[in-house]
Structures are given as structure tokens and as C-alpha cells.
Amino acid sequence: MSPKFLSLLTAEDLKDVTALDVGCGTGQLALTLAPLCRRVIGIDRDAEAILKARERTGALSLHNAEFVIADADVEEYTAWAPQLVAARLCMSPAIIARSGRALGPGEVLAFVCFHRDQWKETGVVSRFAFDEGEIRALLEGHGFTVEHLEIEREVHQFASAEEGVAQAAGLRAKWESNGRWQRYVEFLEGGGRTLTRSHLIVKARRR
């Protein structure tokens, strides 16, 4: 998890805060926040991920963290009354809109999301990826003032096409299903020798 992202969260006084982790997966972010917050709720539509998050909570003996099966793009967040909404690699216009409705003045939405340059060598832009202007406009349009926005980028460089294939081997099955793999191989065969990981780190405060 990005140290910069964590520092943006922990810069807030969290001891009396109810935090909502949207798209929580198996709970990594929520369980990191739990010792710092009054209460943490993680939501995800993946029932298996929620079960694992609950198991991790029990193993850590955390009593202020709970995990709920819910679609972050569909459910309204007001029922959980959060003072902080956080997300890691789960972002959409619907999430920003729901956060804007749930948070009060001065309260924070903080997240890491895919930048449009994520895996740019594959020639496919994720529908969950944004550039700086897009994310700023969405936030400002839903009542937020952007306090921090930066790109965290890592470019892997390879000496050969074979090395590039090996670097992305863990992504092959997923990329074959969405058309990325063949384009990435073509990029390497054409002389390309990079693979870019690029995220936006954002903190915004409700006006």
C-alpha cells in the first residue's frame, strides 16, 4: 500500500471517525485504519472477499471493524454515516457522487485509483482509469475541494521481449480475457521494453 496514501489518511484526526472503505476486497485498507478509527466499515460486492475480510478481523481480534456485502456503485453510503470515505484501486463516478452525498462539510474522501497510463503498453485504457483533469472535475462537481492530487508512477524496463513477458506473466490470464495480452506482446515484438504502473493518489474535502 502506498505510504503517501496512508500519510494523507493519518494526517486526519481519526480517533472519533467512522470510516467507510469502498471496494474493500479482503480488508487490507480497512484493517489498517481500524486501530486508528472509532469504527470502520468495509463494503464490497464480492462475497468471498468479504468472508476473508471477516476472517482476518477475527484473527486480529478487532472489534470495531465490520464488512458488508454491498455494491459501492449502487448502495448509498448515508446509512453508515461515515466521516471519511476511502478507497484503494476502486473508483468510479458513482462512488464520488455517493461520497458527496454521504459526507458533511470538512469531511474527507481519499483514494488511490488507476491513472490512464496504467499498463499503457497494452493499448487498452481501463474504464476505471482517470486522468488528473477528469478526476478533479468529478470531485469539484460533487462538492469537493481537491487538497492533494499526484501521480505515482513506476516504469519497469526490460533488456529483452522475453523479460517483458516474464514480468507480466501473473497478469496473462486476465489480459488474455480482455485483449490486453496480444497487444502487449505486439508492443514487445515491435521493440517496446517497458511496462508502466500508474496510479492517482487523491485527497479531497467536502465543501
Which residue ranges define each predicted feature?
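A SAM-dependent methyltransferase catalytic signature shared across enzymes that methylate proteins
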Residues: 136-151
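A short glycine-rich, Lys/Arg-flanked "PGG" loop and its adjoining helix->strand segment in the class I
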Residues: 96-108
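Conserved alpha-helix/loop element of class I SAM-dependent methyltransferases that forms part
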Residues: 1-17
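Class I SAM-dependent methyltransferase SAM/SAH-binding core
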Residues: 20, 26-74
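Conserved class I S-adenosyl-L-methionine
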Residues: 108-134
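Conserved Class I S-adenosyl-L-methionine
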Residues: 150-207
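A short acidic, Gly/Pro-enriched loop at the edge of an enzyme's catalytic core
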Residues: 74-84
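A short SAM/SAH-binding and catalytic strip from SAM-dependent methyltransferases
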Residues: 82-96
